[in-house]
Amino acid sequence: MRVDLFDFELPEAAIALRPASPRDASRLLVVRPGDPLADRGVRDLPALLSPGDALVFNDTRVIPARLSGIRHRAGGSGQRCEAMLHLREAPDRWRAFARPAKRLAPGDRIRFGSEGASEVCALSGLDATVEERGEGGEILLRFDLSGPALDEAIAGLGALPLPPYIAGKRPTDAQDTTDYQTVYAREPGAVAAPTAGLHFSDALLAGIDAAGIERVHVTLHVGAGTFLPVKADDTDAHRMHAEIGILDAATAARLNAVRARGNRVVAVGTTALRLLESAADPDGTIRPFSGATDIFITPGYRFRAVDALVTNFHLPRSTLFMLVSAFAGLDTMRAAYAHAIQSGYRFYSYGDASLLFPEGAPVSESIT
């Protein structure tokens, strides 16, 4: 499909630079194809679902994946550089997006720290070798540290990887370390937050439990590729970067039981949805999954594992807007986004939320 079909005018002021406070005070737009749009609040979610439905949360935890350092090369002067980690390939190896990538070559050494200051790195020992340089600024780094020691060094020297549409407008601060993490995050490894989950407070989770709605956790370590723009003119020419996901056998059995009794599986966020769809058979049976997925969902895709989706408002021409357009229909989503913009909904990672039902959902699934 042509990428420009997913373009729309988004006022810059609509991009939220801070989340709602408290986090469950966000607005919620309910979108069901064929029904009028409904302006609600995230706190209404327990009343909008049915007892026995299951909300599927991505419990990945964001790590401070943005590293600054100095490139060292024999016979040359140092060059400042930045690496945004996005995919761990081994205990001592990460794929990263580098700036300026053109100044890096295989064999280069990088010392990471406070702009590469040696006194900082003497404490952390965080040095790396560039093993590969790929397309789009991607490099493969082999660190001198490995496993938990590397994790500890990254935690001490890295910075929170706020999306560029936020980080370009204001500096990251201490509040972001709380705001840009879900309250249920427990599996370190993401370099971007599963942002639909940012709306859920402990109080809202208690309300979900009280309403008889199941809470299920899966893990997809969100990569920095989620920030990348689609540069191709056609969706067929775009390739997603792989992300690592885990869905165990007990979780698969729980979710299959939910649907077998006639209830719905509701994904909290596009990351949870992408993992569920990656784990599902053509007949909708969810299987255990552990590994990489690069699933790219565009209109025409037949959804197998997800009956509803909680998600934020996404940017024009993004793979995420393509996904929600595949789920609820392109015309439906264009109309919903036009309403959201006109009504002052806040967009992107720190913005408001929507509850989407798929095209062709039976009338019995309608909500009030």
UniProtKB/Swiss-Prot annotation:
S-adenosyl-L-methionine in keyword set: yes
Uppermost EC category: transferase
Localization annotation: Cytoplasm
Pathway assignment: tRNA modification; tRNA-queuosine biosynthesis
GO molecular function: S-adenosylmethionine:tRNA ribosyltransferase-isomerase activity
Disulfide bonds, paired cysteine numbers: none
Gene Ontology CC: one annotated term: cytoplasm
BP GO annotations: queuosine biosynthetic process; tRNA wobble guanine modification
Origin: domain of life: Bacteria
E.C. number: 2.4.99.17
Function: Transfers and isomerizes the ribose moiety from AdoMet to the 7-aminomethyl group of 7-deazaguanine (preQ1-tRNA) to give epoxyqueuosine (oQ-tRNA).
NCBIfam families the UniProt entry points to: PRK00147.1, queA
HAMAP family registered for this protein in UniProt: QueA
Family as reported in the entry's similarity comment: Belongs to the QueA family.
Subunit structure: Monomer.
Protein name: S-adenosylmethionine:tRNA ribosyltransferase-isomerase
Gene: queA
